[in-house]
């Protein structure tokens, strides 16, 4: 079956925002107006089409990014819904990785909020072209112009209004399209499906002219001919203006800002037009790079004639179809029934069912092309971030990087049957979400779940209980401490066990020193003259690595350490890889003692937004949690407090903050860095764990 839509007519985009900015409602309206959804789902009634997991429906927040295909003005839109809660930033990163463009939704009353900054920075990291939609213009306190200023002050970006609101709060009627210089007004009776172009109201004409001039000046800067014509008094026509704005979006020169109220069905159709006019198609963004089997860099262009390459960006367990792997096809054509290779894991796979997903229903397809986002059922080996490709032309596309989890809880199944269900469920959850890790505590035998925050783990436990029907006891959350040495240590160690028969003998000399923060563990062998034969070096490494997971301070993983093997001795008969493993283990433990190992604790970047009346209490409380206040500024009439606080002192903070501020203050936190724990904290932790 030949391609229906040219690749130039694709728009793969996501909608990113702070929690509660109206992202899901905006997506819902897009699906409604593009004819994919027959009933509008309201988030506050828990029925939105995109929010399809039971946990999301209950909490009213979007957790998993579902991919949806819709059509507008002959263009094919693939929409990735991204979560807005800080515990799910991994999902946001993952969807930004496979998008070509994004719509950043702001709450016009709040402007740029903490999580908006986080997702914006992630967008910068992946260089995602963006347009901005100032939503909730009907809300009390909505201020479009404050949003523009916020984008400058808080994101350091250049906003350019391409629309202006007509009225605000209860009087929000529609908008002025500055590109066409027309007013667009919505008919309330038709659920916003009907709107009409009219002349710009007299009282707003001057303002419209002023902002149109600003828009044109920003646009013509990108084109010498247009600039010369403009300086001669010739304004660019509509087509030229759109071309220049599109160029600005693709280069990140400025960000067009639109306005509307998704909930009141105003401004959604012009937003869709802007997606088509200004966001890139797969051929407008740089071609994806990868590594071939010889380690050379190769490029895969967005073209059906290129060798097949696709990236798995999301894995979900579907009750009807089984495991579904969402993939972005970067190049080539994918047909069901063909064999592909998972180059990341060097495993072969056969493509079975191929599905086009609409938020909650699916359409079987036989063929998909470059630029498509498809769901594949029944892949056995694929994990998030894996590359699937043509076996004749293997390539590994850029890897996704996932942050280390900072919080953990123990989970104990109540019965043997639960134990079996838990094993299956955890394997599936870990495959779906790389920021969620599962391990077993060697000493206690407990299963440990690790994640990015309390909410992240709460949701996982909820899924275990609801979806997989696992009955289990959950322990209190624990902090993921680390250990590192603080000074260089030199050790010589001999392991000797020679009492008749084949004995054991190995001697090693190490220099162990702190590595750069974040550099991790590094092993270097500087042995000369065969004092430790080559075949025993893996034994040496194995011995060191067996200690890395459990340091000498309180049994936590050791990080940022460099171990150099400088010398050693061996015996022709009694030496073995095992003997060197035992010697290295003991030598490394001794070095950790000598090198003055210390305990590291995760420090979180906390931002509290509070009415001025409670500022004193909030700061006092953060100080009592060993927080270091980094600074304060005003946002509207609220005070924003930035602080660095140890994670161990942030448990249950949400309830404290609520009661302290009568529910009016909010906070967000994310992992920032590891720092040495004070002596009293270290002693307390040692007493508890060592």
From Swiss-Prot:
GO biological process per UniProt: ribosome disassembly
Annotated ranges, domain tr-type G: 8-283
* Assigned keywords, A-Z: Cytoplasm, Elongation factor, GTP-binding, Nucleotide-binding, Protein biosynthesis
What taxonomic classification does the UniProt entry list for its organism?
Bacteria, Pseudomonadati, Pseudomonadota, Alphaproteobacteria, Hyphomicrobiales
Record family assignment: Belongs to the TRAFAC class translation factor GTPase superfamily. Classic translation factor GTPase family. EF-G/EF-2 subfamily.
**Which residues hold GTP?**
17-24, 81-85, 135-138
GO cellular component assignments:
cytoplasm
- The highest taxon in the source lineage is Bacteria
Role, per record: Catalyzes the GTP-dependent ribosomal translocation step during translation elongation. During this step, the ribosome changes from the pre-translocational (PRE) to the post-translocational (POST) state as the newly formed A-site-bound peptidyl-tRNA and P-site-bound deacylated tRNA move to the P and E sites, respectively. Catalyzes the coordinated movement of the two tRNA molecules, the mRNA and conformational changes in the ribosome.
Q: Which molecular function term from Gene Ontology is one that the record holds?
A: guanosine tetraphosphate binding
Subcellular location(s) per record: Cytoplasm
PANTHER family attached here? RIBOSOME-RELEASING FACTOR 2, MITOCHONDRIAL, TRANSLATION ELONGATION FACTOR G-RELATED
Mind telling me which Pfam families this protein's record contains? Answer: EFG_C, EFG_III, EFG_IV, GTP_EFTU, GTP_EFTU_D2
Q: Which SMART domains does the protein's record reference? A: EFG_C (SM00838), EFG_IV (SM00889)
Q: What is this protein called?
A: Elongation factor G
């Amino acid at each position: 079956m030949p391609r229906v839509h040219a690749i130039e007519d694709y728009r793969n985009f996501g909608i990113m925002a702070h929690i509660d900015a109206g992202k899901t409602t905006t997506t819902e309206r897009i699906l409604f107006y593009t004819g994919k959804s027959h009933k509008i789902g309201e988030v506050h009634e828990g029925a939105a089409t995109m929010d399809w997991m039971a946990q999301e429906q209950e909490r009213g927040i979007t957790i998993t990014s579902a991919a949806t295909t819709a059509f507008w003005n002959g263009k094919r839109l693939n929409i990735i819904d991204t979560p807005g809660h800080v515990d799910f930033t991994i999902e946001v990163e993952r969807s930004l990785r496979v998008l070509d463009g994004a719509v950043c939704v702001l709450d016009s009353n709040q402007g740029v909020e903490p999580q908006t900054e986080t997702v914006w920075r992630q967008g910068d990291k992946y260089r995602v072209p963006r347009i901005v939609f100032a939503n909730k213009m009907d809300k009390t306190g909505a201020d479009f112009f404050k949003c523009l200023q916020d984008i400058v002050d808080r994101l350091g970006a250049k906003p350019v209004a391409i629309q202006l609101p007509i009225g605000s709060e209860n009087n929000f009627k529609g908008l002025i399209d500055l590109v066409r210089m027309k007013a667009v007004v919505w008919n309330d009776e038709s659920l916003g499906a009907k709107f009409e172009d009219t002349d710009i109201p007299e009282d707003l004409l001057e303002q419209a002219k002023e902002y149109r001039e600003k828009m044109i000046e920003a646009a013509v800067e990108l084109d010498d001919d247009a600039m010369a014509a403009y300086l001669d008094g010739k304004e660019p026509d509509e087509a030229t203006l759109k071309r220049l704005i599109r160029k600005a979006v693709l280069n990140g020169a400025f960000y067009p800002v639109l306005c509307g109220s998704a909930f009141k069905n105003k401004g959604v159709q012009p937003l869709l037009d802007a997606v088509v006019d200004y966001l890139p198609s797969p051929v407008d963004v740089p071609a994806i790079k990868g590594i071939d089997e010889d380690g050379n860099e190769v490029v895969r262009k967005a073209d059906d004639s290129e060798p097949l390459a696709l990236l798995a960006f999301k894995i979900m367990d579907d009750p009807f179809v089984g495991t579904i792997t969402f993939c972005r096809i970067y190049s080539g054509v994918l047909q069901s029934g063909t064999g592909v290779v998972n180059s990341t894991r060097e495993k072969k796979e056969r493509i079975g069912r191929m599905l086009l997903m609409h938020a909650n229903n699916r359409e079987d397809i036989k063929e998909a092309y470059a630029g498509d986002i498809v769901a594949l059922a029944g892949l056995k080996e694929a994990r998030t971030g894996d590359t699937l490709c043509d076996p004749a032309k293997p390539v590994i596309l850029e890897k996704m990087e996932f942050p280390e989890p900072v919080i953990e809880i123990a989970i104990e199944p109540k019965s043997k049957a639960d134990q079996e269900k838990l094993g299956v469920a955890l394997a599936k959850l870990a495959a779906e979400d790389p920021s969620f890790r599962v391990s077993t505590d060697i000493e206690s035998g407990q299963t440990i779940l690790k994640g990015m925050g309390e909410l992240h783990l709460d949701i996982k436990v909820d899924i275990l209980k609801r979806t997989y029907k696992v009955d289990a006891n959950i322990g209190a959350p624990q902090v993921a401490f680390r250990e590192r040495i603080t000074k260089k240590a030199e050790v010589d160690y001999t392991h000797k066990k020679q009492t008749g028969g084949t004995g054991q003998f190995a001697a090693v000399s190490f220099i162990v020193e702190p590595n750069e923060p974040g550099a991790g563990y590094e092993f270097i062998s500087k042995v000369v003259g065969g004092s430790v034969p080559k075949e025993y070096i893996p034994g040496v490494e194995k011995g060191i690595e067996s200690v890395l997971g459990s340091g000498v301070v309180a049994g936590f993983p050791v990080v940022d350490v460099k171990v150099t093997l400088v010398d050693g001795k061996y015996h022709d008969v009694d030496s073995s890889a095992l003997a060197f493993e035992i010697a290295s283990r003991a030598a490394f433990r001794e070095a950790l003692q000598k090198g003055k190992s210390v305990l590291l604790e995760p420090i979180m970047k906390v931002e509290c937004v509070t009415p001025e009346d409670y500022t004193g209490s909030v700061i006092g409380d953060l100080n009592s949690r060993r927080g270091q206040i980094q600074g304060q500024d005003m946002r509207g009439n609220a005070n924003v407090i930035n602080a660095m606080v140890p994670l161990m002192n942030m448990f249950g903070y949400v309830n404290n903050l609520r009661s302290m501020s009568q529910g009016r203050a909010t906070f967000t936190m994310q992992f920032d860095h590891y720092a040495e724990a004070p002596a009293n904290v270290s002693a307390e932790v040692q007493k508890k764990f060592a």
